[in-house]
UniProtKB/Swiss-Prot annotation:
Organism, as annotated: Pyropia yezoensis (Susabi-nori)
Quaternary structure note: PSII is composed of 1 copy each of membrane proteins PsbA, PsbB, PsbC, PsbD, PsbE, PsbF, PsbH, PsbI, PsbJ, PsbK, PsbL, PsbM, PsbT, PsbX, PsbY, PsbZ, Psb30/Ycf12, at least 3 peripheral proteins of the oxygen-evolving complex and a large number of cofactors. It forms dimeric complexes.
Record localization: Plastid, Chloroplast thylakoid membrane
Keywords of the record: Chloroplast, Membrane, Photosynthesis, Photosystem II, Plastid, Reaction center, Thylakoid, Transmembrane, Transmembrane helix
InterPro entries per the UniProt record, alphabetical: PSII_PsbK, PSII_PsbK_sf
Keyword Transmembrane attributed: yes
Protein name in UniProt: Photosystem II reaction center protein K
Record lineage: Eukaryota, Rhodophyta, Bangiophyceae, Bangiales, Bangiaceae
Propeptide: 1-8
Any one Gene Ontology cellular component term annotated for this protein: chloroplast thylakoid membrane
Annotated membrane topology: Single-pass membrane protein
Lineage top rank: taxon: Eukaryota
Gene that specifies this protein: psbK
Amino acid sequence: MNSALFLAKLPEAYAIFKPIIDILPVIPVFFLLLAFVWQAAIGFR
């Protein structure tokens, strides 16, 4: 499996997507915050 090596060294064509790839691990945290805000909005029923 060289996928980790491939992802660590992206080709030049995908260099513009690097900021997006850096943000990807944070997305589950946003879902957690969204769930909390949603529950707060409906009053924690």
